[in-house]
Amino acid sequence: MVDKKSPLIAVSVGEASGDLLGAHLIRAIRKRCPQARFVGIGGELMKAEGFESLYDQERLAVRGFAEVVRRLPEILRIRRGLVRDLLSLKPDVFVGIDAPDFNLGVAERLKRSGIPTVHYVSPSVWAWRRERVGKIVHQVNRVLCLFPMEPQLYLDAGGRAEFVGHPMAQLMPLEDDRETARKTLGVDAGIPVFALLPGSRVSEIDYMAPVFFQTALLLLERYPAARFLLPAATEATKRRLAEVLQRPEFAGLPLTVIDRQSETVCRAADAVLVTSGTATLEVALCKRPMVISYKISPLTYAYVKRKIKVPHVGLPNILLGKEAVPELLQSEAKPEKLAAALADWYEHPDKVAALQQDFRALHLLLKKDTADLAARAVLEEAGC
């Protein structure tokens, strides 16, 4: 029988964006149930909320098919260990946050043993591999969706799902304040500033950081007073960035690596170069023009290209239903093209103003009390 005062809630996340969602979820659950206990796999932000992580979350932060194949034995070992540990601990509910290829397998095994399961952040079934919907309905009791077009797919398949809004839209202010952001970071108000967001995973840094830094050098030729800001999500990414920056060709690049503070960095920027993923939505909610880029192994790219069912990869473009911002991917992700696209935003404020109106409408659409809605659903599944 569930102890309604101190339920044991298992949570598993695979990367930095999931760690942030997990931290907010823990905080929201504690408001409703102060004695709740949390265990599973989490990152630094979740640990700061009192979460007990049984395995290193960084070991799951891999990108793309080819990268997963190389690390598959270790990932499967961690998953088997987590299932074994949770079957022993018998949590009142399991919440898998994103990382569906890892978490849904855990959820399915726990659900068969009678443990209620929730998947928080629907996989992009509306974009590719839509056949997964029926399987997901079988694997979990409930899906918590961040985007409004997602729940109906699960409802049509006989599952339970709801739109809880996107946490960033709820947490981030609707209005823009570049001046305050620049003051916070100690950046001159009158100079060109570009933010570089190469990704939160070490594997993304390996692919994207050299290209982004080469792009910055080209922008510096065009705007000699420019400065570049880069928020590092974790200590692991910070260490890898430092290694890349030690290369001779990047000596003298006026780039500041900042601990986290990605929102402040984006608000301080005139334009943002960002790797496709959750970060693109954060940039949009900051009302900043961006150029979206992505490079992955040829094997992964060939697989994804065959499967994808939508014309865009960037979340802002998908949600707005048009290419509102440029996407330069794979062979198109060349420093010369990226620099030209960023310069186009910097030199055309009228285009930026129109884009900001689109981003404001998107912000209003996604704005809900996400963490509280998710907490309510999780506690309901736990019987609290």
Swiss-Prot record:
Cross-referenced InterPro entries: Glyco_trans_19
Protein keywords: Glycosyltransferase, Lipid A biosynthesis, Lipid biosynthesis, Lipid metabolism, Transferase
Keyword Membrane attributed: no
Pathway noted in the entry: Bacterial outer membrane biogenesis; LPS lipid A biosynthesis
A GO cellular component entry from the record: membrane
Keyword flag Lipid biosynthesis: yes
EC number in record: 2.4.1.182
Gene Ontology molecular functions: lipid-A-disaccharide synthase activity; phospholipid binding
Catalysed reactions, as listed in the record: a lipid X + a UDP-2-N,3-O-bis[(3R)-3-hydroxyacyl]-alpha-D-glucosamine = a lipid A disaccharide + UDP + H(+)
Superkingdom to which the source organism belongs: Bacteria
BP term (GO), one: lipid A biosynthetic process
Leading EC class: transferase
Family membership noted in the UniProt record: Belongs to the LpxB family.
HAMAP family per UniProt: LpxB
Function noted in UniProt: Condensation of UDP-2,3-diacylglucosamine and 2,3-diacylglucosamine-1-phosphate to form lipid A disaccharide, a precursor of lipid A, a phosphorylated glycolipid that anchors the lipopolysaccharide to the outer membrane of the cell.
Protein name: Lipid-A-disaccharide synthase
Annotated source species: Neisseria meningitidis serogroup C / serotype 2a (strain ATCC 700532 / DSM 15464 / FAM18)
Gene (UniProt): lpxB
